[in-house]
Structures are given as structure tokens and as C-alpha cells.
Amino acid sequence: MNTDFVYTFPPLIPGILKRRYKRFLADIELESGEMITAHCANTGPMIGVCDAESQVYVSKSNNPKRKLAYSWELIEVDNTWVGINTALPNRVIKQILEQEKLPHLKGKYNKVRSEVPYGKDKKSRIDFVLTNESQQNPIYLEVKNTTLAKDKIALFPDTVTTRGQKHLQELMDLLPDAQPIMLYFINRGDCQQFSPGDDYDPGYGKLFREAVKKGVEILPCRFEITPQGIRYLGLADLKF
């Protein structure tokens, strides 16, 4: 067992992507020749990570209540595996936080809470709140899955996201009573840098720069994705 994985996949099944459609669905030809329809958890445009005839991996659930037994997990892009399952980043980050495996935050907290209400009228939920009895200001941490890349630079977002803009504004509104952090989960191992996706959502890019100036901390976390598991590679350089 490889102990440097922060997440280990169950046995995955190789195949070839035939098409992705209706946002949630992907037709895949398995190595055995069987054609299946898998669930696609990523409902965004998936720019550059849903090309037909690409190598992919799927997982299979034994839950009889599931409409689709297979879930699309990975795709190969330019000899790099990219994570497709958008449910994974938060699970991985939660595990890393609970095991204190994120060096940047090590020793700054001793309690992790998930999906905590915050913001105006407590109608929003932050992914994680980290607290420490000896620390006055709690850490509020939001996670964003990042798969788009251009010239080895990871970019977020890949489309206009009013929800993402709202999250940036709400993190700014926490200052100065909390330490807000936006963590970008770079779901591919080939990017050394991170930038806001200005070409895809200029409004987000503007808010991103405002957030940095006001004191929102940005953690662009690099991960290597393999069919066996996920490794943490450290922080990407910010470029903006």
C-alpha cells in the first residue's frame, strides 16, 4: 500500500469515452468491449477534459438503488490523469485536514467542522471551519475543484459562476473577525501555476484580486491523480 496517497481509489475499470451529454451522462466503452452509461458528477462545461476517444476510468457501485451503477472518475489529457468526480475534492480535503497533512495549516487548528452556516442570515454554508481554543479568529475555508488548464497553468472558473463570485464576496465579508481561505483543488498534476480564469468569468477575476488585496488567503493546492490514488504535491505559484 502506498502511504503517500491522501486518497486511495477503489478498483477502477478502464475504458474509452464516447460522448458526454445532458451534463450528467457519459457513454463509455469498457476495455471488455461493453458499452455503458456512467454518471458524470461534473455538470460544468468541462473544457478540455471531455474529449471523445480519451482514455478514462470508472468505478462501479454495488448499490441496487442507484440508477447508474458506474461513475466516471478520471480522464487522460496530454498524458496526465485528471479527476472528474467533483464529489471527491471536499472528501479529500476533509481527510487531509483531519489528519493535519496540509503543512500550510498544520498547528493552526484542532477542530474541523463541515458545512457550517455563515453569511447574511446564515443562509450560506462554508465547506470547513477550523478552530483552536488558543486562536481568536477561526479559519473559514472554501474548496473549489479546478480542472481547466492552459499552458500548464490551472484556471478557475471555466465558465461564469455567480455562485463562485458570491463565495468570494462572503469570504471578504468575514474579515477581520475570521481568517478566510479559498482553496483551489487542482485536480491534475501537470500545473505549476494557478490563475483566475479571466477569459471565462471576468467578474470572478476582478473579485479574486479584490479578495487577495483585502486579506483572503489563496491556497492553490496541486494534486497528482493516478488510477490508484491521489497525492498532494504542494502549492502552485499564483499568477495574476
UniProtKB/Swiss-Prot annotation:
Picking any one GO molecular function of the record gives: DNA binding
Matches recorded under Pfam families:
SfsA (PF03749), SfsA_N (PF17746)
Q: Which InterPro entries match?
A: SfsA, SfsA_C, SfsA_N
Instruction: Give the CDD domains listed for this entry.
Output: SfsA-like_bacterial (cd22359)
What family is reported? Belongs to the SfsA family.
Q: Tell me the protein's name.
A: Sugar fermentation stimulation protein homolog
Species, as recorded: Crocosphaera subtropica (strain ATCC 51142 / BH68)
The protein's gene is named sfsA
